[in-house]
Amino acid sequence: NLKDLLIEPDTAFIKKLKAGETDKKMGIELSIPTFRLAGLNLYKAITDNKINISKILFKDATCKLLMGKKPKKIVKHNDDKEFNIDSIYMKGLDGISIGKIEFLRNKFEIYDLVNDQLIVNNKDLKFELKDFFLEELKGNNDYFRLHLENLKLELLKEEFMVPGGNYNLNFERIYFSMADSILEIDGLLLKTTYNDKYELAKKLKFTSEIYDIAVEKIKISAFDLEGMIKNGIYIIDSVAVKGLHLDILMDKRLPFNTDKRPKLPNQSLKQMRSPLYISKISIEDSHLKYQEKYEGYEEPMTAILADLNAQIHFATSVKDSISTGKSMTVNLQSNFMEKPPLHVNFIFPLDSRADTFYFEGHLASAKMNEFNKASEPAIGVKFIKGDLKEIKFSGSANPEISKGSMTMLYSGLEAEVDKKNTEKDKNIFLCWVANTVVHASNPGKNNKL
C-alpha cells in the first residue's frame, strides 16, 4: 500500500503555463490518498522477471488538468520517443499482466488558468479496467506490445459539469468491451443548471438552442478502436439509440446571429477533419419537443414528434466512400403533435458541389385545432374547427435556395388570424394561411383543388 501520494507542478511552472511561456499545453495535479496492489507475486517477479497483479486500487484520488494559454512556441519532439502500444520499452522485465484496475470515489477536474474557472468537474468517479497485459516482442529484448484485445471498461453513475457551467452531464453506466467491439451508455442525461430555462436565455447574446436531453440507451457496435487510436479514422458499423427524449427551446425575443450559418448535414460531413464512416444509425421509441418563445405570446410555439423512429444510412466523410456517388438517407416516422402519423424521407447527396438535398413526406388526417400550439404563436393562426384529410409535400433545398410543392386536403375549416403583430403580417407563410382559410374546404364544391 501507498498512502498520500501527491504530484503537483511548482508555482513557477504554473505561472509560465498560464502565460503561454512553456511548450506544454497543460499541467497535472494528482493526489492519491490510497494506492493498493493486490495479488502481486514478488517471488515470481524477482525470479522470472514477470509481474502478475490481480488488482490495482486507486481510492479517493483527485486528478486536475490545468489548462494554460496556447504556447507561444511549439517544440517538435522526436518521433522515436513517442508512445507506441506496439513497441513499449521497459528494461529488465519479461512481461506484465494486470487483472483489474479499479478507481473508487475519485474526482476529475479541468481548470482554466487563464480565465480562473473550473470548466469540468465530476462528483464521484468510479470505474474498472479489466484484462490487459504486456508481452515481450520476440527478438526485441526489453520491448513490449500492449495487448488490449480483452480489455473491458465499466463506469457507474457519474455526473460532470459541462464547460461553461450551464449544463450537467450524467449517466448511469458506460460499458466497453474490446473483444465484443461494443460501447454502451445507459441513462444519459444532459440538463441545464437552471430550473427556469428562460433564466439561461437571459445570459445569451443571440437566440440559440437550449437543450434538455435524456437517453435510455446508446449502443455503438462493431467499430475499429485501433484504427481510431493509431490513424484517427472512425469506422463504425452501427449506432442504436433507444428512448431519446430531446427538448429544444429557442427564445426568439433575442436577436438572430447573422454571422452564424448552420450547416446542412451533408455539408457538415464533408467538412469534417477526421474521416468518419457510420453504416447505420437507428433511433427508436423517442420523443422530440421543439419550442420557440415569441414576443406577445404567453405560451411558446410547440411542435412535437412523438413515438419517433428514424433510420440513417451511409453517414460518411471518407472521400473514397463519397466518390462512389452514394447518398446518405434519413427515414423518419412519428406522430406529429402526438396525433397524426407523419412520414418524412430525406436524401443527402454527398458527392455534390451544390449541397442540395431532397425530401418528401406525408401527414395523415387530424383535427385542425390539434395544431394550435404550433400555429398560433408561430404564424398567428388559431384553428376553430375543421378536419385535415392529408398533407403531401416534396422538394429540394441547399444553403442558397429551396423549392417544392405541397398539397393540403381539408374540410369544414374555420380559423382566426391574428393581425396585431406587424412582424407576423410580413410573414409570407402567414399571408398564404390567411388566404387559405378563406376557403372552408379543399377540394371545394366542384372537387377542384
Describe each PLM feature range.
Residues 1-4, 42-44, 49, 53, ...:
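Elongated, acidic membrane-bridging lipid-handling scaffolds
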